[in-house]
């Protein structure tokens, strides 16, 4: 092989390594948020531990990410946390938890990390998105969920704050959201054009009214059936990134998946995303290069019927997060020493030895 061809081969190898390092050099902060007071079912506070036990940190490290594990946050129960309006449960406790999480997410994003928040229930998204917006005020949100979580404290049929975080986030709804205890620190940080829903299939009447009358973009499971997930993602990016690149916050509720895939969750709804659809969403978000923060919420190990259901749900959560950071279904070969830019050929001596053995 000539000196020139050796040089070209070495140069190609170096270019491949540089491209790979650029692609896989995510600095990822993982924040555990073991919180359950945004809803009534016990066990979702064990979600972070279940996802960690399924190998999240190792998976991200193997993808070439520099992982900074911030551990689990501590959330205090506010004493005498009375109902608001005779229905909204634990407002002070939820408000305080979201404030604590917002501060931690802001710190992580401000330090240059892509932030992964492990829930916990989905009320936490108010905190994670608020904290993210403190560092990236032009962010946009992709909300993957069976539910819209956009009730207000005055429309909620359950009183559970995990069904209300988006109403607190949107500027257009602030004249409909009363100043409830625990949220005096909070300010809306999104406009209606900054969010797109994917996977909806269980809406309350007030939520249907809000989505329609405030012209908020969403793609229900029917839309996905009719259009296909590829078209849904194209339209999502057209809206959120069509005019400019900006940071993406992905808030992913595990109940977006069909319960056959993710049984260990508190509000399962039949007819959800397939594995392929869910992972396609996160693969495409990764491919934009604009992902800045991820929530993975509502994994509840206590509600699983068997240990296998816990494992299946937690493993699915890990796959969702890993595909946000470059895991592909073709296989993720991320280490520089595994790059192959040319296939090996047999040496002359090897061929001669084989010929000699045949003659013998």
Swiss-Prot record:
Induction context: By thyroid hormone (T3).
Binding residues for Mn(2+) 2: 145, 147, 253, 255
One GO term of the biological process aspect: urea cycle
Source domain of life: Eukaryota
A GO term from the CC aspect: cytoplasm
Name this polypeptide is given: Arginase, non-hepatic 1
PANTHER family listed in its UniProt record: ARGINASE, ARGINASE-2, MITOCHONDRIAL
Subunit structure and binding partners: Homotrimer.
Cofactor binding remark: Binds 2 manganese ions per subunit.
Gene Ontology molecular functions: arginase activity; manganese ion binding
Needed co-factor(s): Mn(2+)
